[in-house]
């Protein structure tokens, strides 16, 4: 459980010091491998994978400490905008996810052709849906903004959020970067497109 391992936000990466499901499976003789994003502290830690193929972990083992769930929240030194680019295109994260998906398909084909019938686990991690909100056009075209409703529970419409959510929004909130509802809808469409992309 997250309260036992202390990894409940993007600030604290899992380091394997408390055994997880992967270690337990390895201990029983199972083959356990990963392809793609894990977002753990380091590939060098005993996180429960016999092999990590093209892993993505926390940069230098440190997460977004400023966004940690703590009292009080840290102040950001400058406005932090995650929506610098929204719309059709191909980001480096999209390329990474495609590479991970292709590697997983090849891994599964090789496994199917193997005579080894021992149990195995393959975990495949993707970055999407994640900022930047950029998706290949064939996926973005699936979500015309005129068909997307605006969020129902929005403070600009009088909705009262939980105080904790208000505090978090004051630290890393992004909605105030949008000048128009059309921009909000473009962001929602791009997010949905990234979900379909995955």
Model-found features: residue ranges?
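Formylglycine-dependent sulfatase
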Residues: 1-198
């Amino acid at each position: 459980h997250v309260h036992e391992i202390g990894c409940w936000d993007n600030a604290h990466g899992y380091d394997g010091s408390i055994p997880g499901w992967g270690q337990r499976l390895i201990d029983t003789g199972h083959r356990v491998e990963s392809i793609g994003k894990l977002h753990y502290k380091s590939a060098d830690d005993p996180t429960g994978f016999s092999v990590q193929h093209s892993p993505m972990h926390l940069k230098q083992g440190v997460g977004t400490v400023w966004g940690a769930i703590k009292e009080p929240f840290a102040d950001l030194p400058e406005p932090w905008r995650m929506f610098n680019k929204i719309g059709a295109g191909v980001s480096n994260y999209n390329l990474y996810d495609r590479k991970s998906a292709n590697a997983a398909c090849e891994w599964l084909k090789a496994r199917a052709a193997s005579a080894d019938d021992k149990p195995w686990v393959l975990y495949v991690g993707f970055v999407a849906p994640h900022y930047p909100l950029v998706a290949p056009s064939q996926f973005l075209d699936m979500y015309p903004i005129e068909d997307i409703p605006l969020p129902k529970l929005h403070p600009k419409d009088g909705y009262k959020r939980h105080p904790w959510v208000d505090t978090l929004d004051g630290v890393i909130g992004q909605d105030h970067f949008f000048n128009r509802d059309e921009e909000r809808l473009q962001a929602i469409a791009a997010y949905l497109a990234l979900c379909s992309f995955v």
